[in-house]
């Protein structure tokens, strides 16, 4: 714990300077970001980030420069800083070391990020899951709460050493929900909805300098339409950061492979001022970079854990500790 506090004390001034410099000289600052990323000890993760930024630096017409300018013009820098440190150091560096050690010790898969479905009625269950997950080195969480509750906001607030991506409906964004997150800096909200709902939500989020993204769903039937240029352009108005693509139900391997390769292609082309992420495939890719595994897990509101290593057996975290559930997925 002391070592982690010391590491944060060393990293935080570098992040502060980097964010300050981004406003004045994005291109030069990005070169400093490259140096900072390479200073992190997790080589596999650093090298992949380095490759992405190098492509950006060699492309003078990259839309990612527009992305950066949009971020620094509206976003609360404390929000970006807290989320980045928690994700970059606590989750992907310090926590990842614990994950690798416990994974070897127990000969099981432990994910770098845990997806959790929740609502007001299941907040105690969610809080307990996160408590157990942190003991395993997991400090990155994707929380799915369609109608954001005060209980969910409080869970994110008290776990301020973690990074949260909160997936919710755009219709849930209101003065009330924005006020609930007024002092919470370790969260990225991702919204989904109709054009009118997205327009209203993004206006409110920008006005309040919130860190947010947008997400959309795909399945075997509509996966090809995800990459239509008209649709890619459509999302430009509703995110300054990420476009998260999420499978709606069990997709065929063909669909998953198609999404993986084409999402990477969109990122490499750098034509749109957001970063496209395929939640399923990119979660696995990052997991492999960080832990050497290829594992993802989601826990539904009933406490059932599902993973990409499914064998048809259901395991419930209300019947046994999280680690014991993960031990069911032997390497």
Each model region followed by its residue ranges:
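N-terminal [4Fe-4S]-dependent radical SAM core
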Residues: 43-115
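Accessory C-terminal segments flanking Radical SAM cores
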Residues: 1-31, 35-47, 263-331
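Conserved C-terminal portion of the radical SAM core fold
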Residues: 118, 140, 199-306
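Extended hydrophobic/Leu-rich segments
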Residues: 102, 255-256, 326
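Solvent-exposed, charged interface segments at domain starts and junctions
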Residues: 9-38, 113, 199-219, 223-227
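Core AdoMet radical
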Residues: 112-124, 133-149, 159-174, 180-197, ...
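N-terminal start-of-chain detector that recognizes signal peptides
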Residues: 85-91, 138, 160-163, 269-271
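A short acidic, amphipathic alpha-helical/loop segment
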Residues: 128-132, 151-156, 175-180, 197-205, ...
């Amino acid at each position: 714990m002391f070592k982690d506090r010391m590491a944060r004390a060393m990293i935080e001034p570098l992040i502060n300077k980097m964010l300050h410099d981004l406003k004045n000289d994005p291109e030069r600052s990005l070169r400093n970001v490259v140096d900072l990323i390479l200073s992190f000890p997790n080589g596999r993760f650093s090298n992949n980030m380095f490759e992405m930024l190098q492509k950006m630096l060699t492309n003078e017409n990259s839309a990612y420069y527009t992305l950066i300018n949009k971020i620094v013009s509206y976003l609360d820098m404390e929000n970006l800083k807290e989320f980045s440190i928690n994700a970059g150091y606590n989750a992907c560096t310090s926590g990842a070391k614990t994950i690798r050690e416990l994974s070897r010790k127990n000969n099981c898969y432990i994910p770098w990020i845990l997806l959790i479905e929740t609502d007001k009625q299941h907040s105690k269950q969610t809080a307990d899951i996160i408590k157990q997950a942190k003991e395993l080195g997991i400090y990155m969480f994707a929380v799915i709460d369609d109608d954001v509750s005060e209980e969910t906001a409080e869970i994110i607030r008290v776990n301020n050493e973690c990074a949260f991506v909160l997936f919710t409906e755009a219709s849930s964004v209101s003065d009330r929900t924005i006020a609930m997150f007024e002092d919470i800096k370790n969260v990225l909200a991702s919204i989904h909805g109709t054009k009118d709902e997205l327009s209203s939500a993004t206006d409110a989020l920008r006005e309040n300098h919130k860190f947010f993204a947008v997400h959309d769903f795909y399945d075997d039937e509509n996966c090809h339409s995800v990459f239509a240029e008209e649709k890619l352009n459509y999302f430009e108005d509703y995110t300054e950061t990420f476009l998260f693509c999420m499978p709606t139900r069990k997709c065929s391997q063909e669909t998953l492979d198609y999404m993986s390769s084409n999402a990477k292609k969109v990122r490499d082309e750098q034509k749109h001022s957001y970063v496209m992420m395929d939640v399923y495939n990119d979660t696995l890719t990052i997991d492999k970079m960080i832990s050497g595994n290829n594992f993802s897990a989601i826990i539904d509101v009933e406490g059932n854990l599902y993973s990409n290593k499914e064998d048809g057996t259901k395991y419930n975290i209300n019947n046994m500790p999280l680690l014991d559930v993960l031990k069911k997925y032997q390497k």
